[in-house]
Every structure is written in C-alpha cells, then in structure tokens.
Amino acid sequence: MPRLFLFHLLGVCLLLNQFSRAVAAKWMDDVIKACGRELVRAQIAICGKSTLGKRSLNQEDAPLKPRPAAEIVPSLINQDTETINMMSEFVANLPQELKLTLSERQPALSELQQHVPVLKDSNLSFEEFKKIIRKRQSEATDSSPSELRSLGLDTHSRRKRQLYMTLSNKCCHIGCTKKSLAKFC
C-alpha cells in the first residue's frame, strides 16, 4: 500500500514538473509594451529569469563534468598570448596620426616609466622623451573615430546597440516578446 502511494506521488510530481516547463515556455512568448525605465526593468527581470532557467535546464540535461586544471590553464594562456600578439601587431601597424590621437590626456609618470627600458637602448633622456610625448599629444586632432571605424574595431558593439535601439523602439510603440528581449542577455 505505501509503495502504491509513493508511485502515485511520484507521478503527480512529474506531471507538475512538466506543467511548470510548459508555463515557462509560454511565459517567454508573452508580449510586453514598455518604454524607457520600464523596458530596462523588464529586461533585467527577463535576463534573471531566463538565465536561471537555462542554468537549471543545463544541470538537468548534462551534469557538470570536472575538467582537469592542466587542461584549462594552457588554453587560457594561449588565448592571452594570441590576444597580446594581435594587439601588438595592430598597434605596430597603426598610422602615425592615429597613434597620436588615441590619447589626448597628459601621460602619468607610471605610464612614462613603462618606456624606460626602451629609453635605455636609445640616446634620448627621460625628460626629452616626456617632452616629445607632450608635444605630440598637444598637436593631436580628433579624427580617430572614423579611422577606427574603417579598421572595423567598433562594428560589433555598434551593431548590437543599433539592434537593441530598434528593438526598444518596437517594444515602446508596438510591443515585443520576452523571448526577443532575452536574446540580448
């Protein structure tokens, strides 16, 4: 008798679990119409709920398998070295005018001291180097954004912002689904 009761209780729990999944899927298809701060609050709430749902579904579908630390560390080091190599090649290939306009502020002493090993190999003194940097920064003009755009450095973030802006206009005037907002989490 208790065994039969436990099987019935298990069946009820499984049915309730399936019902909550169906409700969660339907919840993402709800249409909301919000503007400004209300839209931002809705976005935060949707991202919080959708990431919790993704996390619980991922844990049910595939439990986390511990990976050895030796496997993780070399890949991170390789990624870092690739990034550093790419950035150093990029900085070396920048036109001289763009190098001058990247920073218009006065250099801090710690930034100038980073170049001291370079100065040891050259005939320039530290004070002369500092004067050259200040002179070039004072001559700089602000033409770098167009040159950065032509190099393709800001296309991804700008494209994502433009998509979000069109979505926010749509959510404000027409309405949008929670699923479409969850894509930006």
UniProtKB/Swiss-Prot annotation:
Please describe what this protein does: Relaxin is an ovarian hormone that acts with estrogen to produce dilatation of the birth canal in many mammals. May be involved in remodeling of connective tissues during pregnancy, promoting growth of pubic ligaments and ripening of the cervix.
Out of the domains of life, which is the source?
A: Eukaryota
Identify the gene encoding this protein.
RLN
What protein am I looking at?
Prorelaxin
| Organism placement in taxonomy | Eukaryota, Metazoa, Chordata, Craniata, Vertebrata
Cellular component, GO, one term: extracellular region
* Family note: Belongs to the insulin family.
Where is the protein localized? Secreted
InterPro entries reported for this sequence:
Insulin-like, Insulin-like_sf, Insulin_CS, Relaxin, Repro_Hormone_Insulin-like
A Pfam family cross-referenced in the UniProt record is Insulin
Keywords (A to Z) from UniProt: Cleavage on pair of basic residues, Disulfide bond, Hormone, Secreted, Signal
- Quaternary organization: Heterodimer of a B chain and an A chain linked by two disulfide bonds.
Propeptide per record: which residue ranges?
Answer: 56-157
